[in-house]
Amino acid sequence: QPSNAFWNDSKIHRFHLEMSEAEWEAMKALDTRKGVAPADSLKKIDGEQREVHRSRFPWAEGSLTINGEHLNGIGARYKGNASFNLMRGSLKRNMKIKLDWTNKDQNYKSIETLNLNAGGLDPSKLRDVFGYWLFREAGVPAPRTTFADITLTIPGRYEQEYLGLYTIVEQVNKSF
């Protein structure tokens, strides 16, 4: 499988994310606690209260360069709730990237979706990698991981801004 070489936790990949300022601003989370969701929608059908600490993260379009290979028309959004709030004020946040956002045939080594974990609560950046490895060693299906140094360009705002080292986690989907 072409993606096997990518999922190598002894290598640090190089990612560069770029999008317009308008798309960057569109990525801001819509917080359901601030009245976006009507009160009635916070109840389940059985009348119990729903989780009210969830944020919706809009998708934005941009481009991603992975190890020198440029991909246009990718979709990017933040992910997480507690982790998102923990990293408030920082450019380094957990993200989900869909490489086939505008072109359903686009991928990188057969990979269509990437989960970028910032590791805000893990200074070692090894917990996800070790945990998933341990599951696989025990015979339990678990996503593969690798690392990437990520930079960001928002023209007029950030130019090749270093976001940091991320853990990249395989998307659990049909091809998993």
Language model regions located:
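Phosphate/dinucleotide-binding and metal-coordinating scaffold of catalytic cores
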Residues: 1-176
